[in-house]
Design a protein with these regions (language model features):
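Core SAM-dependent methyltransferase catalytic element
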Residues: 237, 243-263
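A short glycine-rich, Lys/Arg-flanked "PGG" loop and its adjoining helix->strand segment in the class I
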Residues: 157-172
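A short SAM/SAH-binding and catalytic strip from SAM-dependent methyltransferases
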Residues: 142-156
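Conserved alpha-helix/loop element of class I SAM-dependent methyltransferases that forms part
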Residues: 48, 57-77
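A short acidic, Gly/Pro-enriched loop at the edge of an enzyme's catalytic core
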Residues: 132-144
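C-terminal alpha-helical "lid/dimerization" subdomain adjacent to the S-adenosyl-L-methionine
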Residues: 36, 176, 180-230, 234, ...
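Class I SAM-dependent methyltransferase SAM/SAH-binding core
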Residues: 79-133
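N-terminal, positively charged/glycine-rich alpha-helical extensions of SAM-dependent methyltransferases
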Residues: 17-48, 193, 204
């Protein structure tokens, strides 16, 4: 079974040579087909998830999260949701004066987030939820953040629409996500993202499937201008993307359009 799993992941990695439209279809098919497996996978690697982010980000993810917190603080939100919160780092890095919530579909991830919060000045409210069906009223939130989770949405368009639904008009959305590096260092950076996490995963746990999946999900995710277009189509205005660390990650920002506002 492990050999078959590795073969599937390898096929997805090779798909980086396909046209972007095909890449998007491959990614969506992979996530939809394996959603229960993906939830279980995140549960299995929860105790190593922070280390994985250190590796994928070349150690830069803490600084990236501070950039997200600065964007959110500038907007001065009263009610903030960190969707796909994982082990809670992004939620815990927000201004303690706001009403902060963090949700994730992985219970082991949330357990680690709660444990971290015990030693933090920020005390978010945690709850388990699928980001496609958030138990939140329409327009209830001033801001939503998503860190390293949007590429795992089962249905990207439906997920973005759900984030727009729970935001008030002119509410802020900030997304931090890995992206495809470009420029002179791009080949070396892509090699790192594809090869190093699976290798370390194998050495640490003997199970590299999850790490291969996460590397593949970065390679097939519609980043940059394409994701900005999808955000605009979902009802966000003023959408912009800022690349970080040579394009290893990208910070996306947008506000939910007022009713009747032209997008």
């Amino acid at each position: 079974m492990r050999k078959r799993a590795r073969k599937r992941a390898g096929e997805i990695l090779v798909s980086r040579y396909l046209p972007r439209a095909t890449l998007a279809a491959v990614r969506e098919a992979l996530v939809a087909k394996r959603k229960p497996e993906i939830r279980g996978m995140f549960g299995r690697i929860a105790h190593r998830y922070d280390l994985l982010n250190r590796m994928l980000s070349l150690g830069c993810d803490r600084g990236w999260r501070r950039a997200v917190a600065a964007r959110v603080a500038a907007a001065g939100p009263g009610r903030l949701l960190d969707a796909c919160t994982g082990t809670g780092d992004l939620a815990l890095g927000q201004d303690a004066g706001a009403a902060i919530y963090g949700c994730d579909f992985s219970l082991p991830m949330l357990a680690l987030a709660r444990a971290k919060a015990a030693a933090s000045a920020t005390r978010p409210g945690w709850f388990a939820a699928d980001v496609l069906r958030l138990p939140v009223a329409d327009g209830a939130l001033d801001a939503v953040t998503v860190g390293f989770g949007i590429r795992n949405f089962e249905d990207l368009e439906a997920g973005l629409a759900e984030l727009a639904r729970v935001l008030r008009p002119r509410g802020l959305l900030v997304i931090l996500e890995f992206s495809t590096p470009r420029g002179r260092l791009a080949p070396a950076l892509r090699w790192w993202v594809r090869r190093v996490p699976p290798l370390v995963g194998r050495l640490l746990s003997g199970d590299d499937e999850a790490y291969r999946y996460l590397a593949a999900s970065v390679a097939t995710f519609p980043d940059g201008g394409e994701l900005c277009s999808r955000l605009a189509a979902a009802g966000f205005t003023g959408v912009r993307a800022t690349t970080l660390t040579g394009g290893v990650a990208t910070l996306y920002e947008g506000t939910r359009a007022d009713d009747g506002e032209e997008r």
